Amino acid sequence: MEGYFEKEFVLTPDYCDARAGLSPYGAFTIFQAIATEHAERIGVGGAAMAKRGEFWLTVHSRVDFVGRAHLMQTLNAKTWPEPCDETSIRCFRSYSLTCGDTPVALGRTQWAILGPEQKVVPFGQSGFPRDFPFTGEAGITAAPVRFRDDFAPEDFVRTYTVRPTDIDFGQHMNNVAYIRVLLDCFSAA
């Protein structure tokens, strides 16, 4: 078992923006895809969690673009969970995207495990295997930013009706769907 997972992705049009470069939506989709595949490989993926009535819940996500990648270039995506103790109810998973030797994006997601009866489960009870070889690598190290949630009516940009295709197996709106809704608030120009 390795403490990280790497995979190559060809930057196809579905990962690109109007300038034929990697889009925020595309980067987030790649990061979620490799996290999912890595979790399955180490025994804490959706299938194993579902057997226990649990699922991974994204608490915060951040993607920092540090370079550009363009249509049909090959990207190397890497992910690794950050160490957390057994009593933690949240942990971080980091990501990087490179094009050759050039860094393109860094990502970091804070996760929790939601168990039966919608209760948060400490990682010592259900998270990573006890002997998991955490790498100690660091990506984005800044603490997650919290936004105020006392919005006034003039703060609202648009309404959105959640579609069945937005819902994941945890019966919540999928994380990537939030990114798509947010980006749809802006014009492509």
Residue ranges and their predicted role:
Residues 1-58, 106, 112-189:
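Hot-dog-fold acyl-thioester-processing enzymes
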Residues 61-100:
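Hydrophobic beta-sheet segments that form the core/acyl-binding groove
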